[in-house]
Amino acid sequence: MKQARRFFHNPITTLLPIVTLCFVMSLFHSCTQSASNPNKDLTAEAFAGFVNEQYGLDADDIRRCIINLVKKDNDSTQTDWLARKLYKDNKRLLWIDTYGIGDKADTLISHLKNVGGIGFSEKSFYIADLENDIQRIRSLDFDDRANKINELMARVEYKLTKAYLRYCIGQQFGFTNPYKYLNRLDPANEDTTAKVKEYRHLFDIPMKRPDDDFYAKALNMANAEELGAFLCSVEPQNAYFNELCAKLATERNAKRRWLLLCNMERQRWKRTEANDNPKGRKVVVNIPAFRLYAYSPDSTMEMKVGCGATKTKTPLLTSEINRMDINPLWNIPMSIIKKDVAPHAGNSHYFTSRRYFIVDRNTGKIISPANVTSSMLRSGQYRVSQEGGEGNSLGRIIFRFDNKFSVYLHDTSSRKFFEQNVRSVSHGCIRIERPFDFAQYLLGDDEDEWKLDRIRISMDLEPKTERGLKHVSDTTKSRRLINSVKVEPKVPLYIVYQTLFKTSEGKWEEYKDIYGYDAVMRKQLEPFVASNNKNDK
């Protein structure tokens, strides 16, 4: 018989003819099964004449078996990639120790058995497979087929690690990565023949993602006495998540369960908050709700908004509102010039009726619409702008914040737009229903009335002060009193996408998945989700 290589060390090895039998003996220290076990309470003397190759543990063979599992593993999540990398790099085994499959595995499985409460399937975390295989090990139920001791040990080690990383990284940071699937959703152009596809960037919310430090901590915790506490700590510490989880526990309708699961996942994401506003103010725009929420410590102002159409979606982002411009000039984006403006090149009436003017970018000179062609406008050499004031597409005021998409919040010249229920029609910017009220909110309650009146007068609104009324009564005076106002301190802005949203009254409101983001997220979550969620009913 081939002598097994030394794998584990134990002071009672002198009682056994081979080191591996000592390890088998020590497996019983961790046996917690209450079922009848024919190998129960064995002593060292029981093994005195027992030499059987099927109990021979071989460290190298276990690692070879794990590498074979790695090669066959086609799971594509980041956590599965990390598990494969761990064993390819020949790092230490996490779950097998001197006492066999120790109690840390039981601690992990105990936590994993709760995944049904978050709508997930135990199968996605290999719970039944692990329990069966661990029971085999603890009962010495090996054979020469699929349950050889080294193959069984390798299988348990690898599946425990995959389940562990899936759970702790998923619960801490989210089981999906919106940077990947939302930013590879909409092609940047309609050229289907391009060798390298470019996509529109739709998600730019700063978030904390798992890094090397967290990964190292998770691996260290797998062997630590604090494993149970660590597994508790990675669970979402979020009141909204807990409320949605409680709703999931009583919800039986599959479609509504998916609605809950998608919005629970959004609560797992570790969004990096913008700088705190000293006055406790922040603005949230929820795209599916077509609403803006302006929060103050003691009140919330809500208003309707309009957002980007499905082909020109409003990007999700975090920023700070830092300025407002009154009667802004609109520099028309190149995408709109190419699609909507260039076909009218040479038509002077089209340009003058809309108060558009054309500027040569190189010389700064204004060019007559009659002298340009569509190819000239599409070349990028010419800027097309719309004069500020009445009739401007941006309305009478615009609210600016730093972002890489050239989007902003603004007024609109089409006030009836807000009578529509579905208001996804823009090229990406956000139209707001009550622009002056919003300006007043941003400036704060302690702002002087004359500044507010100058904004009102410049927007052709009725002034509120005697000074303002006197000014507008003099028809010789200009009504353009102010062009730009800084927002100090800056007010945090969050443009989000939540199809379940808790209002300021504490009520959960449900909204249509207008951009299809829930549907995309569902595909990402399906591998984890319990079968009773998967069929719409």
What role is predicted for each listed range?
Residues 1-12:
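N-terminal secretory signal peptides that target proteins for export/translocation
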Residues 2, 32-80, 87, 165, ...:
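Well-ordered beta-sheet/strand-loop patches within structured domains
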Residues 186-198, 521:
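Eukaryote-specific, cytoplasm-facing alpha-helical/coiled-coil scaffolding segments in long proteins
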Residues 7-8, 18, 364:
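N-terminal capping/interface segment
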Residues 17-21, 25:
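Hydrophobic helical h-region of N-terminal Sec-dependent signal peptides
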Residues 32-191:
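Cationic-aromatic interfacial patches
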Residues 27-30:
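C-terminal motif of bacterial Sec signal peptides marking the signal peptidase cleavage site
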